[in-house]
Amino acid sequence: MGISFSNIGTVGREQLITSGSNGEPNWSYIPSKGKSTKTQNEFVSEIKKLAQKAANATDKTEQDSISRQVLQLRAEYLSEVAPDRKQLYQQAKSAMKNQNTNPKCKGIGELTLLDFLEQAEGKNQNLADKQIALAGGGTLKFTILTSGGYGVQIQSQGVNVLLNTGAGWGYEMTPAELTKKDEFYSIYWKEYNAVKNG
């Protein structure tokens, strides 16, 4: 499993790579509704402790470990305002199982030139033309990947709340999550800078 730590806290879209064993999203790093029962004071205390550890970290291994802990805590912190990504994922999985009965539904690397030519001539309908409404309020869409096959996008609240483009699962933050993320990093960097400069 790989995770990018560059520019932590500065982007609205996160790309996280799933564990290779099951291909499922790594829910440790992806915010989803109802993930935590901690109080605001408990969160602030944990955020400050991680910022202090990060400010005092001396080697790359320790810094990477702290960065992973920060991302996990951030996912938990954002869960208060996050869409129910887990539920949407389960609904999308169920909808995709129904699509697998279609002989034209192919996985990564399985689209052929013939598939594209038939599509251009209007002889078949591919998944990229479909949008499937999910019970949780989201929409399941499929994208044709440049590597062949289909990627998956689960959209809700105007953003891709979960997506897989062949390299792993990622997500975009809703406006409420972006605000909450800024709040998280405001606490984090204030404490980090206080320790570094103190």
Predicted regions and their residues:
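Type III/flagellar secretion export determinants
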Residues: M1-G198
